[in-house]
Regions:
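Charged, amphipathic alpha-helical segments
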Residues: 2-16
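Acidic, low-complexity intrinsically disordered segments
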Residues: 3-5, 49-99
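N-terminal acidic leader/helix
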Residues: 13-53
Length: 99
């Protein structure tokens, strides 16, 4: 595995991310996306479905931008990523509704 954190510049022509709820594996990641017009977003323990048992960090950066439909995305910094089996982490419980 490559050393993290690392910053990537996703290809705007990359294949779009597609949700696959039948996927056996997911990638859990911490990242930051900087916008070309200023500002940024960060996420921790963000889950995306993957095909197979691995994903390259460069592809993960592209998947993040596509999944979140970020039109003004600039560099994506991946701080952590880990492939997990669906159901072996806290994604099987319904999210709490804020009151």
């Amino acid at each position: 595995m490559i050393g993290l954190p690392r910053t990537f510049h996703p290809d705007p022509e990359a294949a779009p991310y597609r949700i696959d709820q039948r996927s056996e594996y997911r990638v859990k990641s911490d990242f930051r996306v900087d916008f070309t017009n200023g500002g940024h977003i960060e996420a921790k323990d963000f889950l995306l479905d993957i095909e197979g048992t691995s994903v390259a960090p460069e592809r993960l950066a592209e998947m993040i931008v596509s999944a979140l439909n970020l039109l003004r995305a600039g560099p994506v910094t991946i701080f952590a990523m880990n492939v997990v089996r669906r159901g072996e982490h806290q994604d099987t419980e319904a999210a709490a509704i804020p009151r």
